[in-house]
Structures are given as structure tokens and as C-alpha cells.
A protein has these predicted regions:
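Active-site capping/gating segments
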Residues: 149-185
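Conserved SAM-binding strand-loop segment of SAM-dependent methyltransferases
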Residues: 96-107
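A short acidic, Gly/Pro-enriched loop at the edge of an enzyme's catalytic core
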Residues: 109-116
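Conserved beta-strand signature within the Rossmann-like core of class I S-adenosyl-L-methionine
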Residues: 139-150
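Class I SAM-dependent transferase core
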Residues: 1-48, 53, 83-98
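A short glycine-rich, Lys/Arg-flanked "PGG" loop and its adjoining helix->strand segment in the class I
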Residues: 129-141
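Conserved SAM-binding loop of SAM-dependent methyltransferases across substrates and taxa
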Residues: 59-71
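Conserved SAM-binding motif I beta-strand of class I
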Residues: 74-79
Length: 185
């Protein structure tokens, strides 16, 4: 699959961002570039997954990158903010990717099944895991996109993750960026 859907998604983000503050305008180009790089690195890790939920999808660029680079996977963009969910639906139509959809909220009293969850700038590790326990069938793996190591190490302690199955992956970038993989069985 070509990179064309990613280019279309970026156009949609820039257009939508003129009227709605989806991404801080001063850092738009930097945030877009960073999200594409993060999505590409996650795609390398998640190549074998059939279903992925991008929780707190925001601009949707990480999810669009995943859908473009892993065309066999079903990608769900989890976003409860109505304005952002509207943007995501517009972006999906513009990219014409068949393997991606918006997931606004879980069905009542019913858990969803996905193999992997990605999240960036959503909630703390503990709060995210608590939420996922109530909405996703186990087993699943969560891939947290995190910044400074001292911050996420505190979150790991708070969530009592140090005794659980986890992996810290340094991202290929100049900034302090990490992927924290936690297997939730």
C-alpha cells in the first residue's frame, strides 16, 4: 500500500486544524512528523497483529499510519471527543482506507476483542490499564508512547507494573521517546 493515505490524512488534519484546534498550531508540522514516525515504528512492532485499538486517537495520524503500513490489520481509532471523532471519520473517508474505523465508546456491558492497544498522551499507565480491563477481553498487549524515562518509571511504579511482564523500547528518534509494552493476561 502506498503512502498516499498518510499524505491525504495530513491534508485533512491541516484543513480541520484551521477551524478547530486539533493540534497546537505552533507545533503542527512537528507533531505531524512525530506522529507519522511513531506510527511507522509501531507498525514494525505490530506487523503480526490482526486487530489494533489506538486509544485516545486524537488527530488519528498514528492510526492512519498503522492502517497504511499493516493493511491486513483492522484498526480502531478510539476517540470519545465528538469533535475529534467527527474529524477522524472525515479523514477515513478522505484516505479511503478499508481497514480502519472510529470507535467512540464500548458497547454497554460488552467487552471488545483486540490483540493490541496503542496510546499516546492519553492517561497514566495505571488509569489506562484500569479502563482497558473493563472494556477489552484479555489477553491483550498495550503499547504506551511515552516521553521522559523518569516520568514513565514513576507511572510503572504507581501501576505496580515492575513485577509484571513489560518491555521498554527506545524509539528511533533524537528526542527521549519510548514504547512501553505491557502484556495484560
Amino acid at each position: 500500500m502506498t503512502e498516499e493515505p498518510i499524505k491525504k490524512a495530513i491534508e485533512e488534519i491541516k484543513l480541520f486544524n484551521k477551524k478547530h484546534n486539533l493540534i497546537a498550531r505552533g507545533s503542527l508540522n512537528q507533531q505531524v512528523e512525530e506522529s507519522v514516525k511513531e506510527g511507522a515504528q509501531l507498525a514494525l512492532i505490530l506487523q503480526d497483529k490482526e486487530s489494533i485499538l489506538d486509544l485516545g486517537a486524537g488527530s488519528g495520524l498514528v492510526g492512519i499510519t498503522l492502517a497504511t503500513k499493516i493493511p491486513a490489520a483492522k484498526i480502531l481509532l478510539g476517540e470519545s471527543n465528538k469533535k475529534k471523532a467527527y474529524h477522524l471519520k472525515r479523514m477515513i473517508r478522505a484516505t479511503q482506507l478499508p481497514n480502519i474505523e472510529v470507535f467512540s465508546q464500548p458497547p454497554k456491558n460488552k467487552k471488545i476483542k483486540v490483540q493490541a492497544i496503542t496510546t499516546k498522551a492519553f492517561k497514566t499507565i495505571k488509569d489506562t490499564l484500569d479502563l482497558l480491563d473493563s472494556m477489552v477481553h484479555k489477553p491483550f498487549s498495550v503499547y504506551f508512547l511515552k516521553g521522559r524515562e523518569e516520568v514513565f518509571q514513576k507511572e510503572l511504579v504507581e501501576a505496580n507494573i515492575l513485577n509484571k511482564n513489560h518491555e521498554i523500547i527506545k524509539m528511533d528518534s533524537t528526542k527521549d521517546r519510548f514504547i512501553i509494552k505491557i502484556i495484560n493476561e
